[in-house]
A protein has these predicted regions:
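C-terminal capping alpha-helices of c-type cytochrome domains
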Residues: 80, 101-125
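C-terminal motif of bacterial Sec signal peptides marking the signal peptidase cleavage site
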Residues: 12-15
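Gly/Gly-Pro-rich "capping" loops immediately C-terminal to redox-active cysteine motifs
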Residues: 46-87, 104-108
Length: 125
């Protein structure tokens, strides 16, 4: 009887599961935000940034960003680099790209939870 209850409990907990992962990246909400062609009345991330390493749009490709970002600015974690690049894009302009093209008001357009979700997603790429 006790063994049956344990098995039933394990099955029930397994069936509950968690939030489905978006496949790439670490946040389904972040994936949705990234994929929106318009965010807060302006061009969304996907409009200017590709997720394909060999495809460059207006801004740099974000393929593998989570792996690259940690070593970009000495002493800054990948997560901090990505967050700063979103809320203060002029702080780190990628070599070969023109500064001033990315909107500088994402910190006002997106709330902290949305920025965190976007950072989670991009860090997982």
């Amino acid at each position: 009887m006790t063994r049956g209850l344990i098995v039933l409990l394990v099955l029930a907990l397994t069936a509950c599961g968690g939030e489905a992962d978006s496949g790439e990246g670490g946040s389904s909400e972040g994936a949705e935000l990234f994929s929106s062609s318009v965010l807060g009345g302006q061009a969304g991330c996907v409009t200017c940034h590709s997720l394909e390493s060999d495809r460059v749009l207006v801004g740099p490709s974000l393929a593998g960003l989570g792996e690259r970002a940690g070593g970009t600015v000495p002493g800054q974690s990948a997560r901090d680099y990505i967050r700063t690049s979103i809320v203060a894009p002029q702080a780190h302009v990628v070599e070969g790209f023109e500064g001033g093209r990315m909107p500088t008001n994402w910190g006002e357009v997106l709330d902290d939870g949305e920025i965190d979700a976007l950072v989670d997603y991009l860090e997982g790429l």
